[in-house]
Amino acid sequence: NFYDTTDGGQVNGADAVRQPGSTLKPLLYAMCFDEGLLTPKTIMTDVMVNYNGYAPENYDKKFNGYVTVESALEHSLNIPAVKGLQMLGHEQMIQKMSNINFRQIQKDRRKLGLSLILGGCGTTLDELTGLFSSFANDGNYFAPSFIQSDTIFNTSKVISPASNYMINEILSK
């Protein structure tokens, strides 16, 4: 609150809840790889779809036809991501995110659906930082820490090393 005199109108940007846009797509695809639902070379269709009134679109409003998962992630295509979430089940994605301390996701879990993967949820910079650190740590999640310590707390396996490798290969192109 800008007019709150107790904090001088300051906002902690790292703790502010914001919609994450497409930043959850790497986690989704890694989870699909782990479940054996998809591989980077799996062909998906990027065509108009409608899920009971929910019709996701790509940012450019175009459809690309047949695309690989790798290409879908490289180009941040929305429709293949929604299809991937439908295959995986949004409940499984919500549970994984809850397990690594996505607090707003835990709070809103009953309201979330397929739009979750396109940013239809709330996350914080701290939560996303923790998630993306797992891609640099062989799929292991480490809770963000802002002080140097000899002890590592709150570690858990987010994705397998194999899926982690595939996602890192795609994201590094």
Regions found by a protein language model. Give the residues of each.
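Mid-domain, small-residue-enriched loop/turn segments at the edges of structured enzyme/sensor domains
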Residues: 55-58, 89-132
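Extracytoplasmic
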Residues: 23-24, 39, 44, 64-67, ...
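A generic secondary-structure signal for well-formed alpha-helical elements
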Residues: 31, 35-40, 51, 88, ...
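Active-site SXXK
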Residues: 17-44, 72, 131-135, 167
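A short, well-structured edge-of-sheet supersecondary motif
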Residues: 1-7, 95-96, 100
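Flexible glycine/proline-enriched surface loops and loop-helix/loop-strand junctions
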Residues: 8-14, 65-66, 74-81, 110-117, ...
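A penicillin-recognizing enzyme superfamily signal
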Residues: 2-13, 24, 124-130, 134-173
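Conserved catalytic neighborhood of penicillin-recognizing serine enzymes
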Residues: 38-93, 152-173
